[in-house]
Amino acid sequence: MKNSAMIEACLACFAACEMCATECIKMISADHLRCIALCRDCAEICALCIKLEQRDSEFSHDVMQLCVESCTACAAECEKFAAHHDHCRECAEVCRKCASECQAA
């Protein structure tokens, strides 16, 4: 499979971001609103990245660069809450890995 490490990283990031957003929503805290928004955006961008890469789209590289930006922003926001919430810590770690894989692809 083409860029299988990047696709696996995007899939893991999609799942971690969805889980983090869901857990943050359950906390009902205004402090987490940006985290929720970035996690949801990052998950969608990761999903798009996977789809475009699998069909060898001419836009795949552009979306991978957007994925790097989105994962980096999401990781930075999740890290603000990482000391108190495992789902935020895990999401930040997975986002950093995904950004690295997309950058390398």
Residue ranges with predicted function:
Residues M1-A105:
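Amphipathic alpha-helical hairpins
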